[in-house]
Amino acid sequence: MLYVPPGGSPRRLLLMLHGAGGTGRRSLRLVMAAADAASCAVLAPDSRGPTWDAVPGRFGPDVRFIESALAGVLPEGAGASPLAVAGFSDGATYALALGRANGQFFSHILAFSPGFLIPTHPTGSPGIFVSHGRSDQVLPIETCSRVLVPELRHDGYQVRYREFDGRHEVPLAVAREAMDWFADSLGQPESPRLQ
């Protein structure tokens, strides 16, 4: 599903990945208001299975589907630089893996309540935004973001980390903060060829 904000040509593109058992349409609702404010188009695909294929252990058909969806969108002018991959819950875990493995293509990663870091062969150095609710009972902050953010920083990534009073969710204020951080950046992505 492709969402283009009203009132003109979007200046950037966000690939938004849903949580386990979710849909692209539901994940789009998490960031739509923030995308409107930032003049950002959002591509929100559905995973090929109940969750993204790298979460069980390795990349598979979801990567090829995402690559095809991006190739179909970018030539039509909906995408602009920079390009970010984002996700919520399992989608955030997948976004961190996909974005780090394709850092030459994705300039930014936005991870809302990720679970863990999937081992990958990183390329490039995308900026990373991570948010997590202190009362998250689905993916507890103590064993998730408070562990993976220091690991990302140790690996040399610039990480903006935002804890908030809340549960397993993406509050509008957090979505806007993440989108503003992304919107303030410049850069040219390369052609869409994912690892």
Where are the language model's segments positioned?
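Serine-hydrolase catalytic machinery in alpha/beta-hydrolase-like enzymes
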Residues: 1-4, 10-78
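Alpha/beta-hydrolase fold active-site loops
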Residues: 12, 126-127
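Cell-envelope and extracellular/periplasmic
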Residues: 18-20, 74, 78, 88, ...
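Soluble non-cytosolic domains of exported or imported proteins
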Residues: 25, 57-64, 100, 139-142, ...
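Alpha-helical scaffolding within the catalytic cores
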Residues: 25-32, 69, 112-121, 142, ...
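Primarily recognizes the serine-hydrolase "nucleophile elbow" in alpha/beta-hydrolase
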Residues: 81-125
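C-terminal catalytic histidine-bearing segment of alpha/beta-hydrolase fold enzymes
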Residues: 129-131, 137-138, 142-195
